[in-house]
């Protein structure tokens, strides 16, 4: 049986998982990873001799109608990691982690020019462990959405318009990255570390040294290292965030004990 031909749009963690889930079930004839690849996409679609589908996951660029129209009637199929219309925008997983969610959604939708506003082909909610790592959440949602696309691409149901009030996620930037123990609970700080892993990376200043916080855990009390409590951050709720792994600016990542030995003397 001939595999359906696909142009794949995307880059980053979600795109990698969706691509890997799709690749054995479809023939991917071109990967568009950036805006400049859209021109080649147009040429392929104008010169095609067989049906070509478009599948997108985390492309990061608004695709104009002039390109979307080339893939009608199905349109470009977008795998978006939220239960739309909740958390449209560029950082749905990170925003869901920051607000303490333990249930995450994935939506397979028809792409339209307005951001994440297209009709829905398929949606699913997935429960995750309370402190699941961001990479695990990306993988689970990408596999779920990619598997559905692989199984249904050539026989898509009629999409249904989104229902309910839309909420939005924001573009992540380094201004969000710094921990604020006086303003955050210990759990909120831990959620921030999980959400900002890879980018923009959670930061804190320890004895004048700018550091990236890589992992931590919660505790009811401080956990001194050789008498030092700088890596035990008291949240506004009275609980503590205990830093387990840290990376001083310009240095390699290290465990809390190694950091204390080298910098907390």
Where do the protein language model's features map onto the residues?
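C-terminal active-site/capping subdomain that shapes the small-molecule cofactor and substrate pocket
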Residues: 190-265
């Amino acid at each position: 049986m001939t595999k359906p031909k696909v142009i794949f749009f995307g880059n980053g963690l979600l795109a990698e998982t969706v691509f890997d889930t799709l690749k054995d079930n479809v023939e991917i004839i071109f990967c568009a990873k950036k805006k400049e690849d859209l021109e080649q996409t147009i040429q392929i679609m104008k010169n095609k001799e067989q049906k070509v589908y478009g599948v997108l996951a985390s492309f990061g660029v608004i695709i104009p109608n002039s390109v979307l129209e080339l893939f009608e009637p199905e349109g470009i199929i977008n795998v978006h990691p939220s239960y739309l219309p909740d958390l449209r925008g560029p950082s749905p997983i990170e925003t869901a982690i920051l607000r303490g969610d333990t249930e995450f959604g994935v939506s397979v939708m028809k792409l339209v020019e307005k951001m994440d506003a297209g009709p829905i082909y398929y949606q699913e909610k997935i429960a995750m462990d309370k402190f699941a790592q961001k990479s695990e959440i990306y993988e689970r949602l990408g596999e779920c959405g990619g598997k559905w696309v692989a199984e249904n691409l050539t026989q898509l149901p009629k999409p249904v318009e989104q229902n309910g009030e839309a909420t939005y996620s924001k573009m992540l930037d380094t201004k969000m990255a710094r921990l604020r123990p006086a303003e955050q609970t210990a759990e909120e700080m831990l959620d921030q570390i999980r959400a900002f892993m890879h980018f923009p990376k959670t930061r804190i200043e320890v004895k004048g040294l700018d550091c990236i916080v890589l992992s931590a855990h919660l505790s009811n009390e401080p956990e001194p290292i050789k008498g030092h409590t700088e890596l035990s951050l008291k949240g506004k709720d009275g609980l503590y965030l205990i830093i387990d792994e840290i990376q001083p600016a310009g240095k390699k990542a290290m465990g809390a004990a190694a950091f204390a030995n080298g910098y907390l003397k």
